Curated annotation (Swiss-Prot):
Bilayer topology annotation: Peripheral membrane protein
Coiled coil, from the record: none
Cross-referenced PANTHER family: HIGH FREQUENCY LYSOGENIZATION PROTEIN HFLD (PTHR38100:SF1)
Chief location category: cytoplasm
The keyword Membrane is assigned to this record: yes
Name of the molecule in the record: High frequency lysogenization protein HflD homolog
Location(s) in or outside the cell: Cytoplasm; Cell inner membrane
Gene: hflD
Record keywords, A-Z: Cell inner membrane, Cell membrane, Cytoplasm, Membrane
Nucleotide-binding is among the record's keywords: no
Domain of life: Bacteria
Family listed: Belongs to the HflD family.
Pfam families: DUF489
Amino acid sequence: MSDQLIDRTMAFAGILQAVAQVQHIARHGNSDRDSLAACLNTVLVTNPDTTSDVYADKVALNKGYQLIINQLGDAKDKDVEVTRYLVGILALERKLARGNAMSILSERINQIHRQLHHFEITDEQVIANFAGIYSDIISTLGPKIQISGNPEYLKQSQVQEKIRALLLSAMRSAVLWRQLGGKRRHLVFARKTIVDTAKKSLTL
């Protein structure tokens, strides 16, 4: 098992970790603070020495690994909603990679770094800034990702901002996955290898 495969699977788990949080918040209106923080922190690590540096909370990443096993493995009960979100994120990432928005994205992330001198990463104002980056830079690139869930929660501004912030986190992992050589065809032709890597990467 190559280091690049391990790293690429880690980044893919990062996408699904964030997507799982989006799904949970959309359905239940709340989020686990540690899981939310773990996702948001990945956005801030822009010059990592290793892929592992991006995902400091290895336990939180387990949800992503479990989803890889479920979505790409032999399980019959695959989550169609998770697949739809994943397809949407990967489509937007391709448009981001082709455009010139990266420098603007970098500056906006630097603003959040400065904000963290005064606030925690899960503070409402910080989450609103993450959400603003997604709205201003990412969601303008292509068709919006349609989120399913409880309408009562989805109309709440705080829920909307958390969802957008988490979609930004998913996008960060998608960018990293692509940088590590990730390609859509791997999800079809190398599924078993990816699933095996996810199983070995699970932190128990």
